[in-house]
Amino acid sequence: MAVKIRLKRMGSKRKPFYRIVVADSRSPRDGRFIEAVGYYNPLTNPVDLKLNEEDILNWLQKGAQPSDTVRNLLGSKGIMQKYHEARFAKK
């Protein structure tokens, strides 16, 4: 099972917000997911982004692949840097 960390669209028409979820890559965008690990609201100023860092690092170490947008969001919070440091420190 290929697992992805991606955005699940929520909200109403023209007022989206997103949950950051861990889901099977074959499931639909707004369909079934394994675990919700945060949320992202691009309409607020400043942008509202809340992430469960421990769960995200755990899923990344298990092999979950973030989508391009989620990778950028994780990078802005420094989570990708922590993941790379932990990954290459073991070797």
Swiss-Prot record:
GO terms for cellular component: cytoplasm; small ribosomal subunit. One of its GO terms (molecular function) is structural constituent of ribosome. One of its GO terms (biological process) is translation. The keyword Metal-binding does not apply. Signal peptide: none annotated. InterPro entries: Ribosomal_bS16, Ribosomal_bS16_dom_sf. Keywords: Ribonucleoprotein, Ribosomal protein. Belongs to the bacterial ribosomal protein bS16 family. HAMAP family: Ribosomal_bS16 (MF_00385). NCBIfam families: S16. This is Small ribosomal subunit protein bS16. It comes from Lacticaseibacillus paracasei (strain ATCC 334 / BCRC 17002 / CCUG 31169 / CIP 107868 / KCTC 3260 / NRRL B-441) (Lactobacillus paracasei).
